[in-house]
């Protein structure tokens, strides 16, 4: 299973569409900053066959999306959130505590705009950075394990 992870678009639909087109093979697409990013017609048509998960970000004041979500993917528990409600700009302690409470195997968060992928306390923890700046994340879940990494649109095109 492949998860494409996108965050902090700040309404840059062009970069979002480029990443989705580049990774059409992804089974799941995760948006870590709100529903407006995939509302346009072109984005919806690109994602029509994908499993999509989205949480609201710090600028999504009127969004009906949840601030956090947990879902199963490839036999693993994935915990997603934008991160601002868990203080990720000031450290990962609160984020990790919440993830442990959810029994998460994989934690995906945004808000910092800093691409980072780590293995902490038996969890894969990733911030994809900001797609507006060309940064996004990939999570591959296979029989051999989990691989989380960040990528850059400018290097992929």
List the predicted regions and their residue ranges.
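Non-catalytic positions within long, well-ordered alpha-helices that form the structural scaffold/packing
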Residues: 22, 99-100
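Active-site neighborhood of phospho(di)ester-bond hydrolases with catalytic His/Asp-centered motifs
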Residues: 5-7, 28-34, 53-58, 79-82, ...
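Charged helix-capping and loop-helix junction motifs
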Residues: 90-98, 123
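N-terminal active-site segment of His-dependent metallophosphoesterases
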Residues: 1-49, 60-62, 66-67, 141-144, ...
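Active-site environment of divalent metal-dependent phosphoester hydrolases
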Residues: 10-14, 35-40, 59-64, 86-91, ...
